[in-house]
C-alpha cells in the first residue's frame, strides 16, 4: 500500500530534519503551500511502522514572496535581471529552478530582486500583472518598488546606486552581444534589455 499525505512543507522542524540538499530550510524560508501542510499524516503513518521514502526530495521555487511564500505579487518576466541586496547580479537567470534557488540562498538573507523596465515588466497595457494585480496596488503595499531612475530605485532598495547601475550596464552588454562572460547565460531576446528610461521596477523574492 502506498500512502500519499501531501507533504510537510509548512513544518519547519520536519524540513530541517529531512533536508540534505538545501543550505537552509529554517523559519526564514516560507512555503507556497497551505500552512496546514504540516506532515501529520506522515508522522501518524511512521508511528504504525510505515516506511518513509524520498523524504529528502524537497523542491524549492526561487521566486516567492519572502514573507508569505505567495507568487502573485510579481513584476518582471523570465528575461529580467536578478540582483542581490548589494545590487550585484549573481546567477544565470535562465538556469533550472534548483540552481536558481540554491544561488539565491547563498545571498544575504536569501533575498534577491527582479529588476525590470517597461518592455519586460510583465504588466499589461492597463498595469495588471499576470495574476490580475494592479501595479499601483503592489507599490502601495510595498510588494513592488517603482522609480524613474535606476539610482532612485537603488536608494529605495538600500543599495549603492553605482553598483546597481553597473550591474545593469554589464547585463545589457550581454543582452546586446549575446555573450555573458560572468555567468554564461546564452538565451537572450530583445525583451531582456533594461531600457535607459523609467519607470523601473523591483520585486523582492526568495526561495520557498
PLM feature segments, named:
Residues 1-63:
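Glycine-rich loop(s) and the adjacent beta-strand/alpha-helix scaffold that form part
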Residues 25-28, 134-136, 164:
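A short, structure-level motif marking secondary-structure boundaries and short turns
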Residues 10, 16, 31, 60-63, ...:
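Generic structural "secondary-structure junction" signal
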Amino acid at each position: 500500500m502506498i500512502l500519499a499525505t501531501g507533504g510537510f512543507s509548512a513544518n519547519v522542524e520536519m524540513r530541517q530534519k529531512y533536508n540534505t540538499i538545501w543550505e537552509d530550510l529554517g523559519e526564514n524560508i516560507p512555503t507556497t503551500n497551505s500552512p496546514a501542510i504540516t506532515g501529520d499524516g506522515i508522522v501518524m503513518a511512521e508511528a504504525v511502522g510505515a516506511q518513509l521514502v524520498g523524504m529528502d526530495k524537497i523542491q524549492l521555487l526561487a521566486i516567492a514572496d519572502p514573507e508569505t511564500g505567495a507568487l502573485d505579487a510579481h513584476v518582471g518576466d523570465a528575461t529580467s535581471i536578478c540582483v542581490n541586496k548589494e545590487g550585484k547580479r549573481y546567477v544565470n537567470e535562465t538556469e533550472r529552478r534548483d540552481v536558481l534557488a540554491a544561488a539565491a540562498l547563498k545571498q544575504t538573507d536569501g533575498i534577491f530582486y527582479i529588476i525590470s523596465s517597461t518592455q519586460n515588466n510583465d504588466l499589461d497595457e492597463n498595469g495588471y500583472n499576470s495574476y490580475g494585480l494592479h501595479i499601483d496596488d503592489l507599490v502601495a503595499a510595498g510588494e513592488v518598488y517603482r522609480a524613474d531612475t535606476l539610482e532612485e530605485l537603488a536608494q529605495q532598495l538600500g543599495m549603492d546606486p553605482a553598483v546597481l547601475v553597473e550591474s545593469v550596464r554589464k547585463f545589457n552588454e550581454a543582452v546586446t552581444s549575446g555573450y555573458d562572460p560572468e555567468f554564461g547565460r546564452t538565451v537572450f531576446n530583445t525583451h531582456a534589455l533594461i531600457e535607459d528610461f523609467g519607470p523601473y521596477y523591483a520585486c523582492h523574492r526568495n526561495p520557498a
